[in-house]
Amino acid sequence: MKSSLDEYKHRDSYHELTPREFDPAETARAWAKFIANRNAPSLPTTGVRQVIHQSWIRSNKSGIRAGQFAAPSLAKAELDEKQIFYQSEMRRATQECLHNMNDMLAGAEAMLILTDKDGVILETVGDKATLNKGSKINLDVGGVWSETASGTNGIGTALWMDKPVYVHGEEHFCEGMKAWSCAAAPIHDPADHSIIGIINLSGLTNIFRKHNAAFAAALARDIEVSLQQSLSQMNFKLLEWVVGRKPQRTLAGNDGLAIINRFGRLIFDRSSQYIASAPTVSERLGKPFLDFSGSI
């Protein structure tokens, strides 16, 4: 059986996105040079990985202040709305992972973070002392960690790249975040593979390990598998309920019949038994059919 890492679709990107060697002093000099030349940020910069340099350029274009100390916080009403969605399938799929990691990270000077597709933190677990330190820079529920809000960081850069990524210490764009190391990986919707969240391992720079990005990717993949199982069970129960009400008409009738789950995805189209070779039918199964704002 393949491991989560073997199955992860971006498994070939680990070495590209994880630093082989890291010299914080050299990276700090590269950052200072970059900030001093903000009007010409595309100039080549030595001493920093390309993936980080490109993120600095994006952060600069977004108007992020280099001296920013903390991430902005989402307004309570907006956070409450996001939490309502999180209480459904996403929460069920992540709880085992978060519970297990909470115990593992106790005393390990690290924390695990779950965000939504916009980089808004929904839940944090881990070492209490680290959680308290994180709250000082809004590395806490409600903090907004997209690149456009907080510059180069594990969560925001993983969101932008749609790949697992490591951002260590001086590689962060904002001064207030340079004491931290973050390894993050995107969580994908099992139906359409869009990003629905980020799982992120964070701590002060002493937790730096090259394999942390791969570890985050494995956690993300485990959550995706749990989401897929939950979605399959939900779709099966819906199909079972519909067939149970009028089994003969559902399976053998000539009328058009489509079954759409509560996320607006087509899970059954009776026309497929007559025109199974039609790509428009097979391609539609499991894909968004209605324009719903929710996603799984």
Where are these regions (language model features)?
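Intrinsically disordered, low-complexity terminal regulatory regions
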Residues: M1-T148, G156-Y166, A179, H188, ...
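Terminal output helix/cap of sensory domains in signal transduction proteins
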Residues: I155-G156, S277-I296
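Hydrophobic transmembrane signal anchors and adjacent membrane-proximal interface regions, especially
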Residues: K237-G244, I275, L290, I296
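PAS/PAS-like sensory domain cap-loop motif
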Residues: T130, G134, F268, S272-L285
